Amino acid sequence: MELSQQRVLVTGATSGIGEDIAQAFAQAGAQVKGTGATAAEVDRASAANAHLSIHFHPLDVGDASAVHSFVTGLGELDVVVNCAGVIQRQVELEPEAFAKTIDINLNGTMRACAAAREGLKARRGCIVNTASMLSFFGGGLTPGYSASKGGVAQLTKSLAIAYATDGIRVNAVAPGWIATPLTRALQNDPTRSAQIVGRTPMGRWGQPEDVADPVLFLASPAARFVTGVVLPVDGGYLIQ
């Protein structure tokens, strides 16, 4: 897919799905700005992706003023992909951790969308958010993550309506079980991994590139009449 000269922002771009998405845009010819939560993450990603046109910057999406300053400072944008997020299994049952997860995953997404609106309007751009299979069902050990991703799904639909008058499309992907650092413990648990693969009609774990390609589609002219969609990318896990 050719996206030459597209101006793209990917938050949470220093690892996992976000890093693959940033790489995919750069390989398609886009000019990519990627963010990471810490300077160490940014340094690692910068070194690993030195051969690509991706410029990484530290950004805490929980800091409203920092998000506004950074995103508005980018000027006009064609695409914003919100991947920044956290998950704190078991700990999210405590109110403080629950609130932090909501703030990063849901409020952080809204902060980036709001800050980017004028820049996207200038180029009739689009937003792709990162929801989850847990947008559709509960997680007993991850109430904050599940609630935040359910919120991202509804935020996506709501902003698709609100931003349509500006010519901005807003969609989301909802990844299933993807092989990333966040799921490494489950991948390394033979019993649990077998259960996941057994329920997935496609019969395997997803890879980050399996998510990156649908994101590129949603951001491309091929999806010019697509907005408000929360697209499962889960190998069929949700239909079982």
Task: Give residue spans per PLM region.
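Conserved glycine-rich cofactor-binding loop
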Residues: 14-15
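Short, small/polar-rich loop/turn modules that mediate ligand/substrate recognition or access, typified
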Residues: 164, 169, 226-228
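Residue(s) in the substrate-gating loop at a strand-loop-helix junction
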Residues: 132
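Conserved glycine-rich Rossmann-like NAD(P)H-binding loop of the short-chain dehydrogenase/reductase
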Residues: 28-44
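Substrate-binding pocket helix/loop in short-chain dehydrogenase/reductase
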Residues: 89-102, 196
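Short C-terminal tail/terminal secondary-structure segment
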Residues: 137, 215-216, 227-240
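Active-site helix of classical SDR
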Residues: 102, 113, 148, 156
